[in-house]
Structures are given as structure tokens and as C-alpha cells.
Amino acid sequence: MKKHTSTILLVLVFFVGLSVMLYPTISDFWNEKRQSKAIINYNSLIETLEPEDYSQMFKEAEEYNKKLVNINYPLINGKKIAGYDDILDINGNGMMGYITIPKIKVELPVYHGVSDKVLNSATGHIQGTSLPIGGKNTHTVLSAHRGLPSAKLFTNLDKMAEGDTFTLTVLDRILTYEVDQIKVVLPHEVNDIYIEKGKDYCTLITCTPYGINTHRLLVRGKRIATPEPEKVVTVITDAYQIDPMIVTPAVAAP
């Protein structure tokens, strides 16, 4: 009886340990599925919009961004512009687009604000910075967590280097940014995320060092032209497979 009980306990300990080990992998996989579904739904929804819908939403976002330029240091003085949560919110859940970072292989929804609910599973747009539509006198700032056991998010943002690119997809626009500055600052140091006259920037923010989180990693990108998508060329041929045993002697011959 004691031997049987010991066996059961060992099996239970094994499965508990296995669950703990597999939790980050399974949870990250689950979150990636949710993120992909949100992006697919977003793309499906924007395909149903009319050109005048795009024009109206971009107009509202442009007006918001212009107001930001006229407010001195909104990140410090706490001034807010009415209607923020409704701008670019096409499906009522706060998603304004998504970010794609090829270097670290992430594609994440971008939501209004940086609440815990947003940052635990996606990227948040910091209110008081430009909405992500590009244009002169804009500086969009996006934030995501790093090192969560449940989601990868910006965990590998420190692997970005100058010259790397990332894109923001907002409605029917794809904005491409090339990394031109990487800095580590203290949380209260915000000079590097202000709007600069005539510039079009997007800065990605996460905590650093990994697991300590006393500072902030800032990865800034300057807007560049979005490359044309590569054309897929289909070649139709009547080619047939040759037995490798026939080819080998021919290749080996002097």
C-alpha cells in the first residue's frame, strides 16, 4: 500500500513539474494564436470599409496629431485630448492596427493605452504621443512587456540594431520605419520621445535590464518608403525528374 502511494506521489510530482516547465511554451503559443486571430479579424474588417471611411478616420487622427503639436509636453503636464479612445477604433475593442518586427519575429496588435490588460498580451500606444498614421511632426510611441512567461511580446527587443526595420499597419496604410537610434534611459527621462519638428518617428519601449526593469529600452525608427511587395513568378514547365543514379556519374566525370 505504501509503495503504491509513493508511486502515485512520484507521478503527481512529475506531472506538476512537467506542467511548470511547459507553461511558458504553451501559454506563449496560445497568446500568439490569439494575436494572430485579432490581426486576421482586423484585416477582414478593414476590407469592408469604403474609401470615404478611411478618409474620415485618417482626418480625425491627423487633427488629433496636430493638436498634440500645440500642447507643450503633454506627457508631463497630463493634458489629454478628448475622443482619444474612439479614434482609429474600427471594431470597438481599442485595436488601432498592428506592428510587425521581422528581426525578432513578432507581429502584435496595437491597442489604445497601456493598461495591464493591453500590455499582458499585446502592444499599447502611449496616450499623449502621436497616433500611428505617420506624417511630419509626429512621434508615435508604443510599449510592450518583456520577459512575461505567458507571452514573448518585446522580450527580444534588445536584439534590434540600427538599420533594422519594422512596420505599422493601420487601416489600409503600411508605414515602414528604420531603426536609427537605440538608448537606455531611466523611466522619468522622456526627452527622446518628444515630437521633433519636421520628423516622422516611431519609438518602441520596453523595460530593461531583463528581469530587473529599472530602466527603459528605447528603439526609435525613422519613417522610410515602404518597399513594393515582391512579385511571385510562376514558372510552368514540362520538366521531369531524372534518376540521381544517372546524374551522379556525369557530375563526377572530369
What are these regions (language model features)?
Residues 4-7, 13-253:
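Solvent-exposed, non-transmembrane regions of membrane-associated and secreted proteins
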